[in-house]
Regions:
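A short, surface-exposed helix-loop junction/capping segment
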Residues: 1-6
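Compact, well-ordered interaction domains used in eukaryotic information-processing assemblies
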Residues: 11-61
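Intrinsically disordered, low-complexity regulatory regions enriched in serine/threonine/proline
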Residues: 55, 62-148
Length: 148
């Protein structure tokens, strides 16, 4: 069947679309980057004084892609080549996923379905530099998930 977004072709195009969308929404600052050590890609933007930091894991997507497309000795190339391809696919796919997620959130805000804070609360950065969700998790403010 394949994974959603596995055939996405341009991470740069998705980044440009996100930037254009957020600028039209009224954001003052926009940045993207990559943590080579963790394989995480990020988008950061500021809206009305609130800094938002969105992260996505190219490695996480690559792992899912490898489950969907396991390496076989019948394939051209080595296992390392196949894993490198998975990471490349993941790097493009996660920006497309972020683009669609941000578009959904911005649309929900614009039509009055939710507020900016409701849409992005867990990703808003606190003055300490950690996100709201990271702070909540560190303080153990949420009950543990049930095993049901």
């Amino acid at each position: 069947m394949g994974l959603p977004y596995e055939n996405a072709t341009s991470g740069d195009k998705a980044i440009g679309e996100i930037q254009k969308m957020l600028r039209a929404f009224g954001c003052q600052r926009f940045a993207t980057g990559e943590d080579y050590e963790t394989g995480e890609l990020f988008i950061q933007f500021e809206h009305r004084g609130r800094m938002v930091h969105l992260k996505a894991s190219a490695r996480g997507y690559a792992a899912a892609w490898l489950k969907e497309h396991p390496y076989s000795t019948r394939m051209r190339g080595t296992r390392a080549d196949h894993e490198a391809k998975a990471l490349k696919v993941g790097g493009v796919a996660v920006y497309s996923i972020l683009r669609d997620w941000v578009k959904g959130q911005v649309t929900a805000i614009e039509i009055g379905m939710m507020t900016f804070e409701a849409a992005f609360l867990s990703h808003i950065l606190l003055p300490s530099g950690v996100s709201v969700i990271e702070h909540i998790q560190a303080q153990k403010m949420l009950p543990a998930p049930s095993n049901a």
